[in-house]
Swiss-Prot record:
It is found in: Cytoplasm. InterPro entries: PRibTrfase_dom, PRTase-like, Pur/Pyrimidine_PRTase, Xanthine_PRibTrfase. This is Xanthine phosphoribosyltransferase. The lineage of its organism: Bacteria, Pseudomonadati, Pseudomonadota, Gammaproteobacteria, Pseudomonadales. Its EC number is 2.4.2.22. GO terms for cellular component: cytoplasm.
Amino acid sequence: MDTLKDKIRSEGIVLSEHVLKVDAFLNHQIDPQLMQQVGHAFATRFRDQGITKIVTIEASGIAPAVMAGLELGVPVIFARKYQSLTLKDNLYISKVFSFTKQTESTIAISAKHLNAHDHVLVIDDFLANGHAAKALIDLIGQAGASIAGLGIVIEKSFQDGRALLESEGYRVESLARVKSLAGGQVEFLD
């Protein structure tokens, strides 16, 4: 997606050979027009898959997931990273390790929102080593739901997330595939 790549080039900040900061338009401040285009791109790629729900993880996956949900006309569920007073009973629970934060979190989805009749599109802001995606896949599996595929806004192709997911038979659609962050420069795969 050329618009996304242009935005990454102009506003993304390479913090290291493994970390790309995109808080100017994706995971702190959000560019609504760009997110609308992102949602449209995901909807175009998965429109014929019979999607009934979109699942993401709070917080950075919410904007692209909501825009895709709007385009596809389906609800969006975001896995919460902590249990609250209102999210405590009848939960699907998994653990996820954050590459960026270097911490493990517990994530949860209420069982009343996801069931075996659902066909799910997973959307997330980044794919690095696949830990967040695998945790979401675990939650969806606990519900007995099926997975149409994964929509990733930015994939760090130099990490093994895609290979891990594809080796397990999952379809991965990434809108921007970063080949390298070496020398403080973003180089795209395609």
